[in-house]
Curated annotation (Swiss-Prot):
Its cofactor is FAD. Residues 2-489 are cytoplasmic. This is Amine oxidase [flavin-containing] B. One of its GO terms (cellular component) is mitochondrial envelope. The modification N6-acetyllysine is found at residue 52. GO terms for biological process: dopamine catabolic process; hydrogen peroxide biosynthetic process; substantia nigra development. It catalyses: a secondary aliphatic amine + O2 + H2O = a primary amine + an aldehyde + H2O2; (R)-adrenaline + O2 + H2O = (R)-3,4-dihydroxymandelaldehyde + methylamine + H2O2; a primary methyl amine + O2 + H2O = an aldehyde + H2O2 + NH4(+); benzylamine + O2 + H2O = benzaldehyde + H2O2 + NH4(+). It comes from Homo sapiens (Human).
Length: 520
C-alpha cells in the first residue's frame, strides 16, 4: 500500500522545506521525506544548558540575501549582528596585526600592489561569468581546465598575497586550491556579490545570525506541515515507469506522487536507485562533484575577554601549523555565553579528525592564546564541535565543489529535470549558492517549476526576483580610484622597464645633440 500525494520532496534541509512550504501554500498535498531524525540538513542548532543554543552548521546571513531573510521573517525569526565593533586580527608568521575593515592592511608597497591586483582581478574575471550559466563565459573552458592553485601561481608574485589568497579559497569553499576549478571558484565568488561581499562581516555574508539559531527555519516549516514531514525515511528507490512516480524509503514505505523534488546534494543521488536509470550526463555528474571538508568548532569562555583588549573576535590566521584559519565572535547578543567560533578547513579537517575532541580543543585554545596574547584563552568552560565530513546524509560542508573540467562538461544538467523529478538544493542556485539564501532560491524555483508543469503558473513566473529586505539593507561595495588603477607587480616592472628605456634613449639623444657622444 502506498501513500498518495501531489509532490514528494526528498530532503528536509532549508531547500526542501522552502519548496514544500511554497507548494503547501499553493494548495498542493506535499510529503517531505528526510533521512535523518531531524530537519535542517546542513543547518543544525544544538540546544543545551551550557550553550543555550548553537549553530553547528550553516549560520550566517547578510545583506543581499533577501529570500532567506524574507522567509525567516515570515516564520517569526529575528536576526542579530555578529560582533565586529572592536579590531580584527591578522596573524601571520607568529605575529598578530590588528586592523579594521574587510581586508588586512599591507604596508610593503610591492606586496600591496600584489594583494590589490589579486582581489581586483578576481572580481574582474567574475564579471565575465554569467551567474546562471558559468559555462557560457568567453574563456569558460580555459578557466575550467585550470585549478585555483594554477591561477594563484599566475596572479600572485609575492608569498604574502599567495598565502592570503589560498586562505581565501580554503575559507570560502572548504577545499584546497589544487582541488577546485578556477572557473567554478570565480563563479562562486561572483554569484555571492564579489570578493568584498563574500568575505565581509559588516555589509557582507557574515553580518548576522538568527536569534535562537538557523535550525528554526526548517523546524518552523515542519511545525506548519505537521505529519507531512516524515523523519528517518532515507529514499532508496524512485520509479518513473508508471502513471505516478513511486518513491520507496529504506524502511520499505511506498509513496506515490505526480512529481518529485530532489533537495539533496547532487552526489547523494548515488544513494538512490532510479527506474529508468538517470540520463547519461546526470548519472556521470553526480559521481564527479564532492563536498568540502570542515569541522566547525565553538570554544566557550566565562566572558568575552578579547573585547577588553579591543579585539572583536575575528581572527585571520595564516600558517600550516594553525589548526584554524578563521574565527568569529559567537557570543550571544545579550553578551552571555561568550564564545569564539572557528573553522578547521579542507586538508586540516582531514588531518585533525585523527585527534580526540579534547586534543583539538587544546590546540585551539593554545592558538587563540597566542593570537590574542591572552592566557585567558587557555581556560575554556565548554566546547562544541561538528565534523561535517562524517555525515552520511550531507557528505561534507559547506557545499559541493567542482574539480577542474567538470563545470563546462556537466554543469548544464545541475537544474535540468529528469522527467517528473525536479532538482533543488543550494548547489542549483544562481545567487548565494552554497548558503542558506541559495537553498531558498533553489527550493522555491523547483516548486514553481512544478506549479508551471501543472498549469498553475506561466513559465515566466518560475524565476522571480526578490525585493530588498527592509530590515537588512545592502550598502554598495565601493573601491577607490587607486584600487581600480594601480598596476600589478608585473605591470609595475614593465612600467619601470619602459621608463628606463625611455630615459636612456632621451639621455642618448641629448648627449648626441650636445656633441657629447664621440665616434670611435
Amino acid at each position: 500500500m502506498s501513500n498518495k500525494c501531489d509532490v514528494v520532496v526528498v530532503g528536509g534541509g532549508i531547500s526542501g522545506m522552502a519548496a514544500a512550504k511554497l507548494l503547501h501554500d499553493s494548495g498542493l498535498n506535499v510529503v517531505v521525506l528526510e533521512a535523518r531524525d531531524r530537519v535542517g540538513g546542513r543547518t543544525y542548532t544544538l540546544r543545551n544548558q551550557k550553550v543555550k543554543y548553537v549553530d553547528l552548521g550553516g549560520s550566517y546571513v547578510g545583506p543581499t540575501q533577501n529570500r532567506i531573510l524574507r522567509l525567516a521573517k515570515e516564520l517569526g525569526l529575528e536576526t542579530y549582528k555578529v560582533n565586529e565593533v572592536e579590531r580584527l586580527i591578522h596573524h601571520v608568521k607568529g605575529k598578530s596585526y590588528p586592523f579594521r575593515g574587510p581586508f588586512p592592511p599591507v604596508w610593503n608597497p610591492i606586496t600591496y600592489l600584489d594583494h590589490n591586483n589579486f582581489w581586483r582581478t578576481m572580481d574582474d574575471m567574475g564579471r565575465e561569468i554569467p551567474s546562471d550559466a558559468p559555462w557560457k563565459a568567453p574563456l569558460a573552458e580555459e578557466w575550467d581546465n585550470m585549478t585555483m592553485k594554477e591561477l594563484l601561481d599566475k596572479l600572485c608574485w609575492t608569498e604574502s598575497a599567495k598565502q592570503l589568497a589560498t586562505l581565501f579559497v580554503n575559507l570560502c569553499v572548504t577545499a584546497e586550491t589544487h582541488e577546485v576549478s578556477a572557473l567554478w571558484f570565480l563563479w562562486y565568488v561572483k554569484q555571492c556579490g564579489g570578493t568584498t561581499r563574500i568575505i565581509s562581516t559588516t555589509n557582507g555574508g557574515q553580518e548576522r545570525k538568527f536569534v535562537g539559531g538557523s535550525g528554526q527555519v526548517s523546524e518552523r516549516i515542519m511545525d506548519l506541515l505537521g505529519d507531512r514531514v516524515k523523519l528517518e525515511r532515507p529514499v532508496i528507490y524512485i520509479d518513473q515507469t508508471r502513471e505516478n512516480v513511486l518513491v520507496e524509503t529504506l524502511n520499505h514505505e511506498m509513496y506515490e506522487a505526480k512529481y518529485v523534488i530532489s533537495a539533496i546534494p547532487p552526489t547523494l543521488g548515488m544513494k538512490i536507485h532510479f527506474n529508468p536509470p538517470l540520463p547519461m550526463m546526470r548519472n556521470q555528474m553526480i559521481t564527479r562533484v564532492p563536498l568540502g571538508s570542515v569541522i566547525k568548532c565553538i570554544v566557550y569562555y566565562k566572558e568575552p575577554f578579547w573585547r577588553k583588549k579591543d579585539y572583536c573576535g575575528t581572527m585571520i590566521i595564516d600558517g600550516e601549523e594553525a589548526p584554524v584559519a578563521y574565527t568569529l565572535d559567537d557570543t550571544k547578543p545579550e553578551g552571555n555565553y561568550a564564545a569564539i567560533m572557528g573553522f578547521i578547513l579542507a586538508h586540516k579537517a582531514r588531518k585533525l579528525a585523527r585527534l580526540t575532541k579534547e586534543e583539538r580543543l587544546k590546540k585551539l585554545c593554545e592558538l587563540y592564546a597566542k593570537v590574542l596574547g591572552s592566557l585567558e584563552a587557555l581556560e575554556p568552560v565548554h566546547y562544541e564541535e561538528k565534523n561535517w565530513c562524517e555525515e552520511q546524509y550531507s557528505g561534507g560542508c559547506y557545499t559541493t565543489y567542482f574539480p577542474p573540467g567538470i563545470l563546462t562538461q556537466y554543469g548544464r544538467v545541475l537544474r535540468q529535470p529528469v522527467d517528473r523529478i525536479y532538482f533543488a538544493g543550494t548547489e542549483t542556485a544562481t545567487h548565494w549558492s552554497g548558503y542558506m539564501e541559495g537553498a531558498v532560491e533553489a527550493g522555491e524555483r523547483a516548486a514553481r517549476e512544478i506549479l508551471h508543469a501543472m498549469g498553475k503558473i506561466p513559465e515566466d513566473e518560475i524565476w522571480q526576483s526578490e525585493p530588498e529586505s527592509v530590515d537588512v539593507p545592502a550598502q554598495p561595495i565601493t573601491t577607490t580610484f587607486l584600487e581600480r588603477h594601480l598596476p600589478s607587480v608585473p605591470g609595475l616592472l614593465r612600467l619601470i622597464g619602459l621608463t628606463t628605456i625611455f630615459s636612456a634613449t632621451a639621455l642618448g639623444f641629448l648627449a648626441h645633440k650636445r656633441g657629447l657622444l664621440v665616434r670611435v
